[in-house]
Amino acid sequence: MPKKISRRLQELRKKVEERPYEPKEALQLLKETATAKFLEAAEAHVRLGIDPKYTDQQLRTTVALPKGTGQTIRIAVIAKGEKVNEALAAGADLAGSEELIEQISKGMMEFDRLIATPDVMPQVAKLGRLLGPRGLMPSPKGGTVTFDLTKAIDEFKAGKLEFRADRSGIVHVMFGKTSFSVEDLLINLKALQECIDRNRPSGAKGRYWRTIFVSATMGPSIEIDVSSLQDLKLTEAA
Protein backbone atom coordinates (compact mmCIF):
# COMPACT_ATOMS: atom_id res chain seq x y z
CA MET A 1 0.00 0.00 0.00
CA PRO A 2 1.51 3.38 -1.00
CA LYS A 3 2.56 5.55 1.90
CA LYS A 4 0.33 8.59 2.30
CA ILE A 5 2.20 11.86 1.90
CA SER A 6 1.23 14.58 4.35
CA ARG A 7 -0.22 17.84 3.09
CA ARG A 8 2.72 19.65 4.70
CA LEU A 9 5.23 17.62 2.67
CA GLN A 10 3.18 18.00 -0.51
CA GLU A 11 3.34 21.78 -0.14
CA LEU A 12 7.08 21.72 0.60
CA ARG A 13 7.76 19.58 -2.48
CA LYS A 14 6.29 22.34 -4.64
CA LYS A 15 9.23 24.55 -3.59
CA VAL A 16 11.77 22.08 -4.98
CA GLU A 17 12.46 21.93 -8.71
CA GLU A 18 13.44 18.62 -10.31
CA ARG A 19 17.00 19.62 -11.16
CA PRO A 20 20.45 19.51 -9.57
CA TYR A 21 21.05 22.60 -7.42
CA GLU A 22 24.27 24.40 -6.64
CA PRO A 23 25.41 23.31 -3.13
CA LYS A 24 24.70 26.60 -1.32
CA GLU A 25 21.34 27.01 -3.03
CA ALA A 26 20.35 23.45 -2.06
CA LEU A 27 21.31 23.93 1.58
CA GLN A 28 19.41 27.21 1.79
CA LEU A 29 16.36 25.38 0.43
CA LEU A 30 16.92 22.57 2.93
CA LYS A 31 16.70 25.09 5.78
CA GLU A 32 13.59 26.70 4.29
CA THR A 33 11.82 23.34 4.04
CA ALA A 34 12.61 22.31 7.63
CA THR A 35 9.19 23.12 9.10
CA ALA A 36 8.61 20.25 11.53
CA LYS A 37 7.84 21.00 15.18
CA PHE A 38 11.25 19.72 16.30
CA LEU A 39 14.85 20.49 15.42
CA GLU A 40 15.48 18.41 12.31
CA ALA A 41 18.73 16.86 11.16
CA ALA A 42 20.33 17.71 7.83
CA GLU A 43 20.70 14.44 5.94
CA ALA A 44 22.70 13.43 2.86
CA HIS A 45 21.78 10.46 0.67
CA VAL A 46 24.52 9.51 -1.79
CA ARG A 47 24.02 6.87 -4.49
CA LEU A 48 27.36 5.38 -5.52
CA GLY A 49 28.30 3.20 -8.48
CA ILE A 50 29.28 0.23 -6.32
CA ASP A 51 27.88 -3.23 -5.58
CA PRO A 52 28.60 -3.94 -1.89
CA LYS A 53 27.99 -7.68 -2.29
CA TYR A 54 31.61 -7.73 -3.55
CA THR A 55 34.15 -7.14 -0.79
CA ASP A 56 36.27 -4.81 -2.96
CA GLN A 57 33.24 -2.56 -3.55
CA GLN A 58 32.26 -2.03 0.09
CA LEU A 59 32.49 1.36 1.77
CA ARG A 60 32.70 1.69 5.54
CA THR A 61 34.66 4.50 7.12
CA THR A 62 34.49 7.56 9.38
CA VAL A 63 34.32 11.28 8.74
CA ALA A 64 35.19 14.11 11.12
CA LEU A 65 32.64 16.88 10.60
CA PRO A 66 34.49 20.20 11.16
CA LYS A 67 31.37 21.91 12.52
CA GLY A 68 30.22 18.95 14.61
CA THR A 69 26.96 17.02 14.43
CA GLY A 70 24.80 19.20 16.64
CA GLN A 71 24.11 16.12 18.74
CA THR A 72 25.19 15.06 22.20
CA ILE A 73 26.76 11.65 21.65
CA ARG A 74 26.52 9.08 24.45
CA ILE A 75 29.60 6.85 24.40
CA ALA A 76 30.00 3.46 26.07
CA VAL A 77 33.37 1.75 26.39
CA ILE A 78 34.13 -1.91 27.04
CA ALA A 79 37.66 -2.45 28.35
CA LYS A 80 39.69 -4.03 31.15
CA GLY A 81 41.35 -2.72 34.31
CA GLU A 82 42.82 0.77 34.17
CA LYS A 83 41.43 1.30 30.67
CA VAL A 84 37.95 1.54 32.23
CA ASN A 85 39.09 4.43 34.43
CA GLU A 86 40.87 6.03 31.47
CA ALA A 87 37.64 5.93 29.46
CA LEU A 88 35.60 7.54 32.23
CA ALA A 89 38.25 10.23 32.73
CA ALA A 90 38.16 10.96 28.98
CA GLY A 91 34.41 11.58 29.06
CA ALA A 92 32.80 8.21 28.35
CA ASP A 93 29.19 8.08 29.57
CA LEU A 94 29.47 4.37 30.42
CA ALA A 95 32.51 2.16 30.87
CA GLY A 96 32.99 -1.35 32.15
CA SER A 97 34.07 -4.88 31.39
CA GLU A 98 32.14 -8.15 31.84
CA GLU A 99 29.36 -6.41 33.78
CA LEU A 100 28.73 -3.95 30.93
CA ILE A 101 28.73 -6.79 28.38
CA GLU A 102 26.11 -8.55 30.50
CA GLN A 103 23.94 -5.41 30.73
CA ILE A 104 24.05 -4.98 26.95
CA SER A 105 23.22 -8.68 26.42
CA LYS A 106 20.05 -8.07 28.46
CA GLY A 107 19.00 -5.20 26.19
CA MET A 108 20.57 -2.10 27.74
CA MET A 109 21.26 0.23 24.80
CA GLU A 110 21.62 3.64 26.44
CA PHE A 111 24.44 4.81 24.16
CA ASP A 112 24.99 6.06 20.61
CA ARG A 113 28.52 4.74 20.08
CA LEU A 114 30.29 1.70 21.52
CA ILE A 115 34.09 1.62 21.70
CA ALA A 116 36.07 -1.46 22.73
CA THR A 117 39.73 -2.26 23.26
CA PRO A 118 41.11 -5.06 21.04
CA ASP A 119 41.67 -7.44 23.99
CA VAL A 120 37.94 -7.62 24.81
CA MET A 121 36.68 -8.08 21.24
CA PRO A 122 36.29 -11.88 21.59
CA GLN A 123 33.73 -11.22 24.36
CA VAL A 124 32.13 -8.27 22.53
CA ALA A 125 31.74 -10.44 19.41
CA LYS A 126 29.08 -12.43 21.27
CA LEU A 127 26.89 -9.29 21.20
CA GLY A 128 26.97 -9.17 17.39
CA ARG A 129 23.32 -10.15 16.92
CA LEU A 130 22.23 -7.32 19.21
CA LEU A 131 24.69 -4.65 18.12
CA GLY A 132 25.03 -5.39 14.39
CA PRO A 133 21.49 -4.47 13.25
CA ARG A 134 21.73 -1.21 15.22
CA GLY A 135 25.06 -0.25 13.66
CA LEU A 136 26.74 -0.30 17.07
CA MET A 137 29.21 -3.18 16.67
CA PRO A 138 32.77 -1.90 17.26
CA SER A 139 35.09 -2.22 14.26
CA PRO A 140 38.67 -1.20 13.45
CA LYS A 141 37.51 0.48 10.21
CA GLY A 142 35.04 2.55 12.17
CA GLY A 143 37.68 3.66 14.65
CA THR A 144 35.80 2.00 17.52
CA VAL A 145 38.31 -0.80 18.27
CA THR A 146 41.37 0.86 19.79
CA PHE A 147 43.59 1.11 22.85
CA ASP A 148 43.76 4.91 22.42
CA LEU A 149 40.46 5.53 24.19
CA THR A 150 41.06 9.20 24.96
CA LYS A 151 41.60 10.06 21.30
CA ALA A 152 38.61 8.01 20.13
CA ILE A 153 36.25 9.50 22.71
CA ASP A 154 37.42 13.05 21.96
CA GLU A 155 36.92 12.55 18.20
CA PHE A 156 33.43 11.08 18.44
CA LYS A 157 32.32 13.72 20.96
CA ALA A 158 33.65 16.42 18.60
CA GLY A 159 31.71 15.25 15.55
CA LYS A 160 33.27 12.11 14.11
CA LEU A 161 30.73 9.84 12.43
CA GLU A 162 30.90 6.30 11.13
CA PHE A 163 29.01 5.51 7.92
CA ARG A 164 28.71 2.76 5.34
CA ALA A 165 27.09 2.11 1.99
CA ASP A 166 23.98 -0.06 2.29
CA ARG A 167 23.20 -3.08 0.10
CA SER A 168 22.07 -0.80 -2.71
CA GLY A 169 25.29 1.23 -2.66
CA ILE A 170 23.61 4.20 -0.97
CA VAL A 171 25.20 6.16 1.87
CA HIS A 172 22.85 7.82 4.38
CA VAL A 173 24.57 10.34 6.67
CA MET A 174 23.41 13.04 9.06
CA PHE A 175 25.78 16.01 8.58
CA GLY A 176 24.40 18.59 11.01
CA LYS A 177 21.20 20.21 12.22
CA THR A 178 18.89 22.53 10.32
CA SER A 179 19.73 25.23 12.87
CA PHE A 180 23.28 25.34 11.44
CA SER A 181 24.12 28.18 9.07
CA VAL A 182 24.30 27.39 5.34
CA GLU A 183 28.07 27.94 5.55
CA ASP A 184 28.53 25.43 8.39
CA LEU A 185 26.35 22.84 6.66
CA LEU A 186 28.39 23.33 3.49
CA ILE A 187 31.69 22.84 5.32
CA ASN A 188 30.40 19.58 6.81
CA LEU A 189 28.97 18.38 3.49
CA LYS A 190 32.24 19.15 1.70
CA ALA A 191 34.14 17.14 4.34
CA LEU A 192 31.77 14.23 3.72
CA GLN A 193 32.23 14.42 -0.06
CA GLU A 194 36.02 14.47 0.25
CA CYS A 195 35.91 11.53 2.65
CA ILE A 196 33.78 9.45 0.24
CA ASP A 197 36.17 10.26 -2.61
CA ARG A 198 39.24 9.45 -0.50
CA ASN A 199 37.82 6.06 0.45
CA ARG A 200 36.67 4.98 -3.01
CA PRO A 201 36.62 1.15 -2.96
CA SER A 202 39.34 -0.46 -5.09
CA GLY A 203 36.76 -2.45 -7.06
CA ALA A 204 34.57 0.55 -7.98
CA LYS A 205 34.29 0.79 -11.77
CA GLY A 206 32.87 3.46 -14.05
CA ARG A 207 31.09 6.50 -12.64
CA TYR A 208 31.56 6.48 -8.85
CA TRP A 209 29.13 9.25 -7.88
CA ARG A 210 25.62 8.76 -9.28
CA THR A 211 23.53 11.25 -7.29
CA ILE A 212 23.51 13.16 -4.03
CA PHE A 213 20.33 14.41 -2.38
CA VAL A 214 20.00 16.39 0.85
CA SER A 215 16.96 16.92 3.03
CA ALA A 216 15.77 17.86 6.47
CA THR A 217 14.50 14.88 8.50
CA MET A 218 10.88 15.54 7.54
CA GLY A 219 11.55 17.60 4.42
CA PRO A 220 11.63 16.94 0.67
CA SER A 221 14.72 15.64 -1.14
CA ILE A 222 16.85 18.22 -2.94
CA GLU A 223 19.38 17.12 -5.56
CA ILE A 224 22.86 18.67 -5.55
CA ASP A 225 25.08 18.94 -8.61
CA VAL A 226 27.90 16.49 -7.81
CA SER A 227 30.55 18.27 -9.93
CA SER A 228 29.82 21.62 -8.29
CA LEU A 229 30.30 20.09 -4.85
CA GLN A 230 33.51 18.31 -5.85
CA ASP A 231 34.96 21.44 -7.49
CA LEU A 232 34.19 23.59 -4.45
CA LYS A 233 37.21 24.54 -2.36
CA LEU A 234 36.78 24.53 1.42
CA THR A 235 37.90 28.16 1.53
CA GLU A 236 34.87 28.94 -0.65
CA ALA A 237 32.65 26.87 1.63
CA ALA A 238 33.90 28.85 4.63
Swiss-Prot record:
Q: Which GO terms describe its biological process?
A: regulation of translation; translation
- Protein role: Binds directly to 23S rRNA. The L1 stalk is quite mobile in the ribosome, and is involved in E site tRNA release. Protein L1 is also a translational repressor protein, it controls the translation of the L11 operon by binding to its mRNA.
Q: What is this protein called?
A: Large ribosomal subunit protein uL1
A cellular-component GO term for this protein: large ribosomal subunit
The UniProt similarity line reads: Belongs to the universal ribosomal protein uL1 family.
A Pfam family it matches: Ribosomal_L1
A molecular function GO annotation? structural constituent of ribosome
Keyword field contains RNA-binding: yes
Determine if Cell division is one of this entry's keywords. no
Describe its assembly: Part of the 50S ribosomal subunit.
Q: Read off the Gene3D superfamilies from this record.
A: 3.30.190.20, 3.40.50.790
Keyword set, alphabetical order = Repressor, Ribonucleoprotein, Ribosomal protein, RNA-binding, rRNA-binding, Translation regulation, tRNA-binding
InterPro entries recorded: Ribosom_uL1_bac-type, Ribosomal_uL1, Ribosomal_uL1-like, Ribosomal_uL1/biogenesis, Ribosomal_uL1_3-a/b-sand, Ribosomal_uL1_CS
